[in-house]
Amino acid sequence: MSRTWIDIMADSKPDLPDNNKKYRISSKSGILSVLRVMIRNNSQATCYFGDAGSFFPTALLNLDSQRGEMVLDYGPNEEINQQALQVEKWNVVAFPNQVKVQFSCQQIGKTEFEGRNAFLAQIPTSLLRMQKREYYRVATPTTAPVKCVIPLLLGKSPSTVEVLLQDLSCGGMAVIDSNGRSNFEEGSVYENCCIVLPDIGTVNVSMRIIRVEPADTGFVHDLQSQRVSCEFADAGENALSLIQRYITRLELEQKRAS
């Protein structure tokens, strides 16, 4: 049986013991509470399905706890919607209040909600709820590097610096500052940092510097480069959804190459 992306992520993350049990919610009241927050916040979600890593944007619209059913928004592409209806299980990821929520959908069908097309699925029997510090980081490729433009603090020269990402998660990233002249200080917050995700889009985040250290670039005479570890101080749900889509794509590409 093919492994889902959730299986890949759970296996890859070393600090989540017992197959994510610490972060899994299995009580009916706990599950409904998390899902209601998603509805109340109108949280944007991404639904992944199939071995090819297909996905579409969605949102949780309604819950019927008596029937054990939930309604999800219909995707914008009818061809993808029809493909999604042919599979037995979906994996849904959302970020209400910047907390990662992840669950599987089963018994999926088409319905109508408030006069428009929608999906009907069974309420999950469990879900994962993980804070930012718990996100798994994935190494970004060197062949198609991810770039980030960081506006420096007032009084700094130059006013911006472009760095290359070394790894990325929905909770933060590590970047390589090749010239080492940016004078990043641990604890400083940099706003409106622009990350360009190849074939996905551009996201803007605020980040806090966690650690600055010499970078191991593999070049003997490279004494300037520094590795800067950051956590996201502020990232909207849409930005987190785009980052998650990019991470998922990298995971699938790495799986195919292995």
From Swiss-Prot:
What UniProt keywords apply to this chain's record, in alphabetical order?
Bacterial flagellum, c-di-GMP, Nucleotide-binding
Domain PilZ spans what residues? 131-248
User: Which Gene Ontology cellular component terms are annotated?
Assistant: bacterial-type flagellum basal body
Family listed: Belongs to the YcgR family.
Q: Name one Pfam family in it.
A: PilZ
Does the keyword field hold Kinase? Answer: no
Q: Assembly state and interactors?
A: Monomer. Interacts with the flagellar basal bodies.
Swiss-Prot/TrEMBL GO biological process terms: bacterial-type flagellum-dependent cell motility; regulation of bacterial-type flagellum-dependent cell motility by regulation of motor speed
Q: Say what the protein does.
A: Acts as a flagellar brake, regulating swimming and swarming in a bis-(3'-5') cyclic diguanylic acid (c-di-GMP)-dependent manner. Binds 1 c-di-GMP dimer per subunit. Increasing levels of c-di-GMP lead to decreased motility.
Q: Where, if anywhere, are coiled coils annotated?
A: none
The molecular function GO annotations come to: cyclic-di-GMP binding
Where is this protein found? Answer: Bacterial flagellum basal body
Q: Which InterPro entries match?
A: PilZ_domain, Split_barrel_FMN-bd, T3SS_YcgR, T3SS_YcgR_PilZN
What gene does this protein come from?
A: ycgR
The identity of this protein, by name, is Flagellar brake protein YcgR
